[in-house]
């Protein structure tokens, strides 16, 4: 999902932002002949994510940096684990330290939070999915992290899937008119999702042939009734008031996917350290 050229372009921008016109500390203290060795260690349990991005930081800074990882993306790591060994020119290691950690800590944090939500759902068929509430220009990395943590992905951007919300319904005149107009104007390859907050809207969405029906902020009993109405005629998405405590109860209503911005927006960074 993350191509090498996409990673490299993004990392170059991050390094440019952080190094600026030069690392005045490192460049005035370290000689070109100075080499360092270090370890990437974890100070807490979690799911590792972002290895290739971490490597890309140092690949850009120097061809002489060597990194050996002992885990792969998606692996569970425990407090005290040595994740990787790294060695190379001191200038490259010191200038890349913060940027490399920013990526791998953030991505591992999201993967870890996603994994917690999927575990909370239990053996139910539902999958936790992300939303478009992401960090600007970091969405691809955050979505990759969700996938790595065991979640599924919602639309990447506005061109992936048509999603009809309340404002669109008001604009079109009715839910039915909105779906019918989209069916006429968009590609057959695009699915249409409708956001519903009442059972009447659910019935209308089923009758007009919506591909995906989102149950927005519905009480559990209403959600169960909505799933009975839909009865396999559309993919059922639950959204709103999703927490680690409520995820299983929502899943047991019979929905197919549970969307939550929390797995990205509220995910804490994973405490990883580069010890040299």
Where do the language-model regions lie?
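Acidic/glycine-rich phosphate/pyrophosphate-binding loops and surrounding catalytic core
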Residues: 2-197, 201-208, 212, 224-229, ...
């Amino acid at each position: 999902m993350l191509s090498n050229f996409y990673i490299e372009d993004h990392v170059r921008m991050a390094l440019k932002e952080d190094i600026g016109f030069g690392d005045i500390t490192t460049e005035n203290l370290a000689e070109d002949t100075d080499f360092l060795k270090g370890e990437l260690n974890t100070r807490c349990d979690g799911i590792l994510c972002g290895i290739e991005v971490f490597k890309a930081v140092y690949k850009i800074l120097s061809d002489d940096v060597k990194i050996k990882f002992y885990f792969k993306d998606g692996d569970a790591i425990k407090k005290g684990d040595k994740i990787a060994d790294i060695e190379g020119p001191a200038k490259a290691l010191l200038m890349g330290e913060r940027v490399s950690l920013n990526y791998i800590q953030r991505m591992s944090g999201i993967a870890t939070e996603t994994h917690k939500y999927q575990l909370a759902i239990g053996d139910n068929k539902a999958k936790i999915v992300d939303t478009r509430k992401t960090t600007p220009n970091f969405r691809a990395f955050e979505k990759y992290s969700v996938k790595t943590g065991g979640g599924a992905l919602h639309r990447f951007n506005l061109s992936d899937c048509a999603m009809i919300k309340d404002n669109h319904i008001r604009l079109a005149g009715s839910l039915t008119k909105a779906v019918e107009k989209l069916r006429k104007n968009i590609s057959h390859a695009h699915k249409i999702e409708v956001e519903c907050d009442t059972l009447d809207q659910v019935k209308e969405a089923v009758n007009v042939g919506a591909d995906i029906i989102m149950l927005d902020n519905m009480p559990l009993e209403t959600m169960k009734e909505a799933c009975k109405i839909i009865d396999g005629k559309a993919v059922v998405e639950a959204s709103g008031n999703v927490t680690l405590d409520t995820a299983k109860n929502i899943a047991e209503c019979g929905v197919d996917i549970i969307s939550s911005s929390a797995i990205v927006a509220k995910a804490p960074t994973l405490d990883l350290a580069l010890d040299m």
